Amino acid sequence: MIITKLHIGHLIQDELRSQGRSVAWFARELGIDRTSCYRIFGAPSIDTLLLIRISLLLKVNFFTFYIDILQNKLD
């Protein structure tokens, strides 16, 4: 089963913008370069440990998006 409706990179980028944070800040806090940030924003899926780090950094549980989709598929 593939979850096609969720593009986690776009959700992360949208949240970063809504918090008024820059890509430079995001890169610095994650210890990565800006190019890697744009790769994250463009990616429809993401490594679990990286998503945990991003969730803690932005104080948003991005896993809830997956849980909602999974629950709808299970119902």
What are the roles of these predicted feature ranges?
Residues 20-38:
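Short alpha-helical DNA-recognition segment
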Residues 16-18, 42-45:
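Short amphipathic helical patch at the helix-1/turn junction of helix-turn-helix
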Residues 43-56:
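Short, basic-rich loop-to-helix N-cap that marks the start of a DNA-contacting helix
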Residues 33, 44, 69-73:
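The DNA-recognition helices of helix-turn-helix-type DNA-binding domains
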Residues 38-39, 66:
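Key DNA-contacting residues within the recognition helix of helix-turn-helix
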Residues 59-75:
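Short C-terminal boundary/hinge segments that cap the last helix of small helical domains
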